[in-house]
Amino acid sequence: MQMEQILEQLLRGESLEFGSARATLERILSGEVPALAVALRAKGETADELAGFAAAMRAAAVRVAAPADRPVLDTCGTGGDGTGTFNISTVVAFVVAAAGVTVAKHGNRSISSRSGSADVLEALGFRIDLPPAAMERCLAEAGFAFLFAPALHPALKVVQPVRRELKIRTIFNLLGPLANPAGAPYQLIGAPSREAAAKMAQALAQLGTRRAYVVHGEDGLDEVSITGATHAYEVSEDGLRYEKLTPERFGLTAHPLEALRGGEAAENAAIARRILEGEAGAPRDVVLANAATALVVAEVVRTLREGVERAAQAIDSGAALAQMEKSAALTRTLG
């Protein structure tokens, strides 16, 4: 099928099947980038399209070998949710790693927000431009590695200028969390809407993910929220399951969204360090909620409250701060 025909099909509101979606993205990655992203945005992406596109992205990615003898998790959101919070999932990654889960965090620089995960990690002293072999050493030796998307998805260089020019969320925002180059079998993914969360969960199920939670806060957060309810879609070998998470489920107090605001990378790095040094307050609580969910996903704990206890112990013992510092130091020796 010609690309013009695909565009016409999408603009008529007709969806692509899995095979057509995969073939389409393979052509995009080889250099054909018309207004496809805009057409998909206007129509609304389906789970089949997401799964097909993600399969093509995974096949084209540079692979990073993850340790086979331990659980490996990714904490990744679609980013740019417009809420202006600090880099929650990045801090969560250190807490979860300190609690015994190897974290292969897939991420990028900011495209529409003030600070992406790559930006805040650099502000915390990380080298992010590591080759795949160095990333593998970070996973094996430190239990944490940052998988810098541009280095591992080189074919996406053809769409990056389009994303920056459009300055709107497109299907590529949704695809990043679905295409972890280390093939992390456990995932905690943040979505930009409840509808997107449901579709991303369906796509993960098609792609054979072992276990994942795809979450969206009613306040707009692409994280587990502590301002109110969070819509959560669980993917497991038993299929898909929806549940609503609230701060009370974690044994935590609700906080206003304003208490979670961040800023540029340097400010967000300072917030991250204060949390890991044990400072109490809303930023710590939202990290505890997300870390607890991640620990449930990785099958380290059974309940959210048990997860909060494990996460709090990782912070209060100094293990999470040590995890961050050890991981950063290793990247500097390898870079």
Regions found by a protein language model. Give the residues of each.
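N-terminal glycine-rich anion-binding loops that anchor highly charged ligand groups
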Residues: 1-3, 10-51, 58-67, 286-287
